[in-house]
Amino acid sequence: MCCEKWSHVAEMLLFIEDREEEYKILCLCSRAFVEDRKLYNLGLKGYYVKSSGNNAGDRVTEEEEDDHSSGTTESHSADEGDLDPEAKLMRSMGLPVRFGRMSTHGSFEVSMNARNKAKVRQKRRKHRKQYLDEIVREDWRNDCEEDDLVVSDDPSSVEHCENNSACEIQSKTDAEAENLPVENTLAPKLEVTENWEKYWNEYGEGLLWQSWQEKYPDQTLSSEPWNLPDTKEEWEQHYSQLYWYYLEQFQYWEAQGWTFVASQNCDKDVCTSHTQVDQNAESSLKADGTTLSSSPNTAEDESLGSNDNDHNEIIAGINKITLSAEEVEQSQLDSSEHCDKPLSEVTGKECPASGGSDSCHGTPKESDISENRSSDQPAQELQESSGTNTSKHRPHHNGTDGNESEDDPPDHKPSKMKRSHELDIDENPDSEVDDNGFHLGFKHGSGQKYGGIPNFSRRQVRYLEKNVKYKSKYLDMRKRMTVKNKHIVFSEESGKPFIRKSKVRSKVEKFLKWVNEPVDEEISQEPLSHNKMQDTCTSSDSEEQDMSMEKTDGLMETRDPEPENCQTISSASELEAEKSEGGSLVAAVPENCSTEGVANSPRAEAEVEIKKKKKKKKKNKNKKINGLPPEIASVPELAKYWAQRYRLFSRFDDGIKLDKEGWFSVTPEKIAEHIAGRVSQSFNCDIIVDAFCGVGGNTIQFALTGKRVIAIDIDPVKIDLARNNAEVYGVADKIEFICGDFLLLAPCLKADVVFLSPPWGGPDYATAETFDIRTMMSPDGFEIFRLSQKITNNIVYFLPRNADVDQVASLAGPGGQVEIEQNFLNNKLKTITAYFGDLIRRPALRSAEA
């Protein structure tokens, strides 16, 4: 079966020297990820893999089946999805996850959940209704107070306004309680702050009206949807939705640290002009906290029609302060020309749309564009709205907006510019082009190219996958570590530089000097103390003793005087006789020694016993669970491959046989399974030739997909091993084994696909910086490919991970195509596979063009 984690990564174009561009070679780069950690863990633990089924990683061991009964397994699987990691850990340790019977716990949990949901639903309804009623009453109260300034002194009109307001309050409350969306059920959590009231009173009118016009473009500006019976309910619902939406947005950005600053620092002329514009627009639209209601006595059709331009200006200016995520990210509005001092003096962050002089993410080019727009438009509109000439206080720049008609609203709203990480592949092709493809992890050598191609003048890589650099960072490409040069600092003193000796070297020097001293001199000299001798001769396993010895001893050994009646060991042979099992040397202390030596001897013996126990524990840890077979233990190089036996063949314990070369030359089973799946899914093929079958790793996987396989190898021993392994997997009847040389048999063969996996020369192939497929293979890699082309153009070339990609691409020939697939095993680059002919998987765009 083909690997699930497979993707096209890049397209590489290689241009041939002294050839036209039409002869370039297209190399499609892809990656396939397979996992076999379970198989590797099975090899480390020494578990037996059952023979039923093909995927051994999903099987359990015989020991696990014996321990768990079927009933326990069913109960565990039923509740597995409801357990958190801690509960799973407790279950794996045999501890109870919960107390009481399962049925009781389940029924109690269901009933409690139903009660809690009902209570929460009732609370939400109650709080929502109370909260809406309070907000609507307060806003209508403010509305009535403002209307008192506009309406006439006739008490009948005031009474009529109050009655209408009361009726509208009741109808609005009922309508909002019914038509409120589901997302507004959390309204009680939104707090109406003073900043929000200022913001809504200043900009809510424009937001509501702009959204209403976008929603119903057919209605004229002179209409009053809040008073018309046909649109009154729609307007109330529209108001409720926008109010809660912008309140939620406002509180979100306020929690992020943004602050709203009212436009109080503007120039007098600018502020005056805006005031006049607001006064002119007041007759058409009355700003309040809840609706855009206006008195019939003051709202006239003539004023509405004449002030359309001013109304559009208000809407365009209000768009600056919409706290939407797009505009906050864009933040390229410039208000520095309108203000005496920048608002950066305000502590904390400021919303870029509220007049901040510095943009958060905008580039200098974007800010210049917005300056040209904003500096040109208001100067013209100030002359239209007020009689005073205010353009002399502001610089006037020539722009293209001056030629627009007077009816068009000023273009203050910034356009949404995508960042580099938001661009699609086709929108910014320059950033996706690379000349060397460093992030792909390929090796480019200078070896001879196939088919007489001199060399490649340049290569061009276009990445098809986003964040290739970031993703490649977490993949093990098996690159060589670059070691930085060390900077050696020499001291200014002319004396001999100090060279620090290692601990082991100083110990050896002390021991050899002490052992080689003459016996006569040792008797005449003062004896060593017992503690010093023990510190000098003990093993180097204990780091604490090493530290104490460094503190007390220098490069030369110091000796403490003791009484003359205390004798020392006469020769090194006696020391060796007294050597303990743990590897430490203990001096024998005679009875006539000083009392200090006798007092210290029990302590030394206790330390020696502790060391023995520690070393025994270490030896027990290093012991393997299952001993290596004799044939593996006799060859040290194969010891690490024994732990990987289930990665090579999941049914290893069923009778798989390998020779010495087969251990490190066979393809891991998961990679072989992926290659076989790709071949079977590419096109309808019947016969596959495995030119160098070895012990049958790839041959068996091809046969498991239902294909007929011709397995060829020049070594009769490997043919016998491959036949045995095929019988273990039950596919021997689908394979025809031929013992012979592929170079001689190739002209006589006919097949749909040829799989090439020639010997790589042993494990030493990985030590080379770049693997030359022509000189490092035996037989020649170019000759093998040439003979395979006589059989079919559908060729699979299995190569080392450090193979020269330029050589592999040259196999496609001028104007040809090849797909180079990187095979990752547990996120480690293991091998690469080159596909030719109909086996190439082309991207969707390429296949559509073809």
From Swiss-Prot:
The keyword Transmembrane helix does not apply. Residues 424-435 have a biased composition (Acidic residues). GO terms for biological process: 7-methylguanosine cap hypermethylation. The modification Phosphothreonine is found at residue 61. Transmembrane segments: none annotated. May form homooligomers. Interacts with CREBBP/CBP, EED/WAIT1, EP300/P300, NCOA6/PRIP, PPARBP/PBP and SMN. This is Trimethylguanosine synthase. It comes from Rattus norvegicus (Rat). The lineage of its organism: Eukaryota, Metazoa, Chordata, Craniata, Vertebrata.
